[in-house]
Amino acid sequence: MAADWLGSIVSINCGNTLGVYQGCVSAVDRINQTISLSQPFHNGVKCLVPEVTFRAGDISELKILEIPSESLKYTSDQLNDHSTGFGYLPTRQQNGTGKQKQTVAHNSAQNIPGQEEGKASEPSSTSPQPCSKSFVDRHNEAVNQPKNFRRRHNSLGSSSSRYPNQVTPKKSGTKNGQLKARDDECFGDELEEIPDTDFDFEGNLALFDKAAVFEEIDTHERRGGGGTRSRGTPNERPPTYRHDENILESEPIVYRKIVVPQSGGQEYCTDSGLVVPSISYVLHKKLLCVAEKHGLSVERRLEMSGVCASQMALTLLGGPNRLNPKNVHQRPTVALLCGPHVKGAQGISCGRHLANYDVDIILFLPNFVKMLEPVTNELNLFCQTQGKQVSSVKDLPECPVDLVINCLDCNENAFLCDQPWYRAAVDWANHNRAPVLNIDPPVGDHVQGIHAKWSLELGLPLALGEQAGRIYLCDIGIPQKVFREVGISYHSPFGCKFVIPLHSM
């Protein structure tokens, strides 16, 4: 009757040490109380040996998963009569009572092809391995896998091939044997066919219409009353605001906030787009006279213009990159060309402030028997600095300086252009190859001998010519009512600065 169980698929539980084995019954030895399984699986992993043999003492539980078709003619009563056959194998004794546990498993619904019968068997066993999937699940995966699928073998599952005749594997006594066994574990498995074609991610992604899916989701949410979520085009998204933006609607921007009674012939605009019209020299002079009458004296105006001009000059010299304690060995040098008038006094005030910032100042001022009081006062203050004063062009440096500040020209003293010292100073500035900054240059009708790169205007700009270079405007502190008194509707274009650039319109 033992031969009737050949070809059956069984599951043998050998306890926690040896694990669970599944396979097809290939031999049953009633005398030696052994059973052999062909094509065995250990804890769901296929063994590398073709056949394993178990003793009855090692078996804790035996389940019959499938009976071959020729054995289905036996009824359950017949199976009970043949209890001495393979269906009821004795298990290990428990608690020393000598009683043995007998278990019969129900037939599985899986249709697994039968194995060959009548194979010779030798007693052997494999080493324990970690528990995994059942034999039936593992077999179904193997059937459903494509031909080019490459199985990844577990290195622990291949340990049984090294000890075919032992239940518990023994370590090799030599070190070289251990290394060789490890190499066999890692590289000994035969490589199966590797798929040649790679997965087409781009082509697969092109088949997915995200916009249509999002639209379907939004439509479903609208019908369900759950509200809408913006996933589509940016036009459908609700407006977002930064932390410094106002969510309230503001009034329209007015760019022309300065209105003059008579245009000077040219208009400028700031970086923010505000329009700054130019005024005539007569209106500019009237504005300064009214401001002086209200308390903005010449000394205050000289101080404000000197501070603004020095700030602009420090920026042109390089700012903090040039003026820092690490660059004491390369202090910038500035040449001041000043005339004997109020505009020259503005340049002297600028030189005094620059000298306080460790800038080497060379002041050129021609000798006059009598000078204006503002010029004398500013010159006395300048002499208290480390700046150098010269009265001859020959004493000016021959090598290029970092910056030249021009305050030679004046509308009231046009005759100074014919003086020899003036012509010599103009020739020196044009040949020094240093950039030139004009402070409060005269109106465009006055011919300027020095070609400037920048020009700084006070209060409101004049209509300057092309030789003035880029135009800048500084605030000298004229009150708004003073502008209104001379007929100018004024709104400050400076923002948070004292000096701003102007662009021609």
Curated annotation (Swiss-Prot):
Organism expressing this protein natively: Xenopus laevis
Region spans: Disordered: 84-181, 219-243
Keyword hit for RNA-binding: yes
Full protein name: Enhancer of mRNA-decapping protein 3
Subcellular location: Cytoplasm, P-body
Ranges for region Required for interaction with DDX6: 186-293
Chain spans, region Required for P-body targeting and interaction with DCP1A: 1-79
Notes concerning its domains: The DFDF domain is unstructured by itself. It assumes a helical fold upon interaction with other proteins.
GO CC, alphabetical: P-body
Keyword Electron transport part of the UniProt annotation: no
